[in-house]
Amino acid sequence: MRDKIKLVSTAGTGHYYTTDKNKRNTPHKLEFRKYDPVVRKHVLYREAKIK
């Protein structure tokens, strides 16, 4: 089953992306380097739960 997740910026800006993942195939937490428009740089984004 694909669950919705939130990718939160580690720059502390509060910016996030939403996506989904298959927990059976990827049980670990996702980490991506993506663009943060608040600081105008690519920073590390980590997986968090959507509340």
Curated annotation (Swiss-Prot):
Record-linked InterPro entries: Ribosomal_bL33 (IPR001705), Ribosomal_bL33_CS (IPR018264), Ribosomal_bL33_sf (IPR038584), Ribosomal_zn-bd (IPR011332)
HAMAP family listed in its UniProt record: Ribosomal_bL33
Q: Please give the biological process terms from Gene Ontology that the record holds.
A: translation
Question: What residue range is the signal peptide?
Answer: none
UniProt KW Ribonucleoprotein keyword: yes
The organism's lineage? Bacteria, Pseudomonadati, Pseudomonadota, Gammaproteobacteria, Chromatiales
The UniProt family comment states: Belongs to the bacterial ribosomal protein bL33 family.
Q: Which gene encodes it?
A: rpmG
PROSITE patterns referenced in this protein's UniProt entry, alphabetically: RIBOSOMAL_L33
* A Pfam family recorded for this sequence: Ribosomal_L33
Q: Which GO terms describe its molecular function?
A: structural constituent of ribosome
Source species, please?
Alkalilimnicola ehrlichii (strain ATCC BAA-1101 / DSM 17681 / MLHE-1)
**Protein's name according to its UniProt entry:** Large ribosomal subunit protein bL33
This protein's UniProt keywords: Ribonucleoprotein, Ribosomal protein
Cellular component per GO, a single term: cytosolic large ribosomal subunit
